[in-house]
Amino acid sequence: VLEPYRHSHPLVDALLMWRKDERIATTYGYRWLDEHVGGDDRLRGAWTACDGAAGRMTAQNGLHNLPAQLRPAICAEPGHVFVRADLGQIEPRVLAVVSGDRAFAEATRSDDLYAPVAARLGSDRPTAKVAVLAAMYGQRSGAAGEALAQLERAYPVAMGLLDRAYADGVAGRSVRTYGGRLIRLGRTPPEPSGSSEPGSAAPEASAATGAESWAVGGADAARGRYARNAIIQGSAAELFKAWAATVRAGVAPVGGQIVLCLHDELLVHVPEAHAAEAAAAVETALQSASRLWAGTGQVRFVADTSIIRRWSEAKE
């Protein structure tokens, strides 16, 4: 309510800042520290390996939703650093694997998938990005609708898979991830609550679809969008787990340990003397894990990898 008036008076801005800080202090204050941070100053939480239709890993006690203001407190032990790796444009690259669209797979050879897609569509990069994300997450109106028509002509195989998934969802038929995990839908539209549900853990998706409601188009449309999301994000979760398991084995010889899995991001704690080796192992693990999961090397997966001392140093 007050946000539109933030700059109208210094008191309004101060009040809004206080409310934000007070919310963080209430949620992550002394009680939270006493309950969840141990005597060794480490935060631990129970993990769920396959949560919701997307099958993502989730964790309790704030591990998956720690505010940015607290991330400077997540620091490596003396003599150690973090190797932080974040998968880039993971959902569209997964779509290339799941659909078997060779033209779309060719676009993944680029570090920035949206650039070759834009060239093929004859549009600019922002429009191409909106079109790809809208195809996966449901927006069909406005600028996205016009760009989608171009996308369907350019990549009919990939778009065909999404259309079939949508039709299965509308009909209440179950769908499967690329790895074969069954996702039951039924006739009742699922509720998109919880950070592990399809569409809620993909920051790029929210940028493309805005505030689109699950109620748009009714229950049938909700099931259709859900099925489409579940296949892509569920398959992406499978790849991420294969990557994490491969990284775990790869960094063990140099004393590295995975300390956090967050959406598409890994944080590896490693002795500083072996940081470069661990970073290389993380990159190598992505290539081997993606080939094993996809059964092909035609689709390229990329990760932004950096060596940092505090989690807050990671590039957003």
State where each predicted segment sits.
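Conserved catalytic core of nucleotide polymerization and phosphodiester-bond processing enzymes
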Residues: 1-316
